Amino acid sequence: FMSEKYLIFGATGSIGSSLAEQLVNSGNSVHLVGRNENETKSISEKLGCTFTIADVLEDGFIEKVKNDISDIKGVAYCVGSIDLKPLRMVNENDFNKCMKLNLYSAVEVIKGYQESLKKNKGSVVLFSTVAAQRGFTNHAIIASAKAAVEGLTVSLAAEFAPNIRVNCIAPSLTNSKIAEPMLKNKACLLYTSPSPRDPSI
């Protein structure tokens, strides 16, 4: 068995850190990227990973990461946000920031590692949300951005085949830090879940 190198953005989130743990437990080498230095260091030390402190909203973030790791088998872009507002309170900056976080920076990551992924017959995993396909109140910002991520996924899957696999996961609410305020609201939980259930299942 040969250890593969994987790169995870959004490593301090529940999904990113869980994925990192699974990959490490399977004998792979994992490099984590997070903007919170203390949390990223803590997770890296716990799992035995290398890491880079970088914010995907800042210019030049991809060069900073590539200086630390240049050759990978796969990348998971687990960065996300839950920005819920009624349309009357939404402004252009809200959309721009959300698109930058969820779409534009993901594109930069994929472009930055495209040659390495092609050489290694690698894979890309992106994340959307069930809200991109189902209408939820106050989700205009995030649903629009994640729908764009889904469009990017199918386009790149066709463009990069058969050398690079590109997939997108679109969960409902997950039992994570970012979703904690919504999970505490039972009415919201029932409304945003396909069926009434515990999101940790």
Question: Which functions belong to the PLM regions below?
Answer:
Residues 191-201:
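Single conserved hydrophobic/aromatic residue that forms the stacking wall/gate
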Residues 12, 20:
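N-terminal Rossmann NAD(P)H-binding glycine-rich loop of SDR-like oxidoreductase domains
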Residues 135-143, 155:
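Active-site loop-to-helix junction immediately N-terminal to the catalytic Tyr of the SDR YXXXK motif
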Residues 129:
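Residue(s) in the substrate-gating loop at a strand-loop-helix junction
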Residues 110, 145:
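Active-site helix of classical SDR
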Residues 86-87, 91-96, 189-190:
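Substrate-binding pocket helix/loop in short-chain dehydrogenase/reductase
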Residues 115, 157-162:
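Alpha-helical segment proximal to the catalytic Tyr-Lys
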